[in-house]
Design a protein with these regions (language model features):
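C-terminal motif of bacterial Sec signal peptides marking the signal peptidase cleavage site
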Residues: 15-19
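A residue-level marker of the well-folded mature domains of exported/periplasmic proteins
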Residues: 27-337
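Bacterial N-terminal signal peptides that target proteins for export
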Residues: 1-6
Length: 337
């Protein structure tokens, strides 16, 4: 299967009029044309969740501008409709179909062999691969470690909380790395990690966050997509600090979200589709680390000047040690308790 979306068309012509004299030309001409790049995105949540799903959605206008792509998307897609959504887009002739999230991996591996002329990308999944299938995996646990360093530096009570959606391996790995980051700067701290079982239930997230706050937690971190808004709301109402996830969420609560763990789904998806459009696609997983534009922390905001500087220094030092190899952030796929 061709890896570049390039079509060579041979146009045969005869009896073509040339100029006013009515002269005739016969022969053949070869043209290289670029077919329309058509990209479909399947989202498990809302395209305006101010986080994980929205960041993926924001890749579409960039692809339209950069490649002249035609794009389409489905949002709030139930798990039991993942496969049909993939098949529908492939049947409609989309060149690229993207599943936003680890949970699309199994479906992609099932569907991809049936549509060899369609490329399938699954984000946040290091396991999927095939001739026309690729997982795009940010080493998000490294950025989560930095978020933990920031949280541990800010916390006065020594109690920090992390609230996540589903207990997927890549989510667990980030939660565990966050915990390690907190303990690196505040040994003996209490780090409470909780999984909601949902990425959508804002009220459940808010109630969970309130319970942590009532127990003395003074910094909250989330990996909960739309439900994470409930975590931020609870922190804002209680007057404690919060760390966003996915994109810079300071705008959600400017006096509460002092930084965010950046996992730039937009940049990662654009990069993945660009490889297909430009013919450099390889059917094996790609990992994006702290040395890429995909991962990091958002600028430190809202904190008092001296504390802000302290956090920036601690985070910069931790990042340098990761990049140099002095600190290795492990991938821990199961909760350690």
């Amino acid at each position: 299967m061709p890896l570049a979306l390039v079509l060579t068309a041979v146009v045969l012509g005869s009896g073509l009029l040339a100029g006013c004299g009515g002269g005739e030309t016969s022969g053949s001409a070869t043209q290289t044309t670029q077919p329309k790049l058509r990209v479909a995105l399947v989202l498990p949540g809302s395209a305006d969740d101010k986080g994980f799903n929205q960041a993926a959605y924001e890749a579409l206008p960039i692809l339209e501008e950069r490649f002249g792509a035609e794009t389409a998307y489905s949002e709030n897609t139930p798990v039991n409709e993942f496969e049909q959504a993939f098949r529908d887009y492939a049947e409609q002739g989309f060149n690229v179909v993207i599943g936003q999230g680890f949970e699309f991996g199994e479906v992609a591996m099932k569907v991809a062999p049936d549509y060899p002329d369609t490329f399938f990308l699954v984000t946040n999944n290091p396991d999927v691969q095939g001739p026309n299938l690729q997982g795009l995996q940010p080493a998000s646990w490294e950025a989560a470690y930095l978020a933990g360093v920031a949280a541990g530096t800010v916390s006065r009570s020594g109690k920090v909380g992390g609230i996540a959606g589903q207990e997927f391996p890549v989510i667990v790995a980030q939660m565990e790395a966050f915990k390690l980051g907190v303990l690196a700067v505040k040994p003996g701290a209490e780090v409470r990690l909780t999984y909601l079982g949902t990425f959508e239930d804002v009220e459940k997230a808010k109630e969970t966050a309130r319970a942590m706050i009532d127990d003395g937690v003074d910094v909250l971190y989330h990996i909960a997509d739309a439900a994470g808004l409930g975590v931020i709301q609870a922190a804002q109402e209680a007057g404690i600090w919060a760390i966003g996830w996915g994109k810079d969420q300071n705008g959600v609560a400017p006096d509460t979200v002092f930084t965010s763990q950046i996992v730039d789904q937009t940049a990662m998806i654009v990069d993945g589709v660009a490889a297909i459009a430009e013919g450099t696609f390889e059917g094996k997983p790609r990992t994006f680390g702290l040395d890429s534009d995909v991962l990091g922390l958002a600028p430190i905001r809202a904190l008092p000047g001296e504390l802000a500087s302290k956090v920036e220094t601690a985070v910069a030092d931790a990042k340098a040690k990761i990049l140099s190899g002095e600190t290795e952030v492990p991938f821990i796929p199961e909760p350690t308790g």
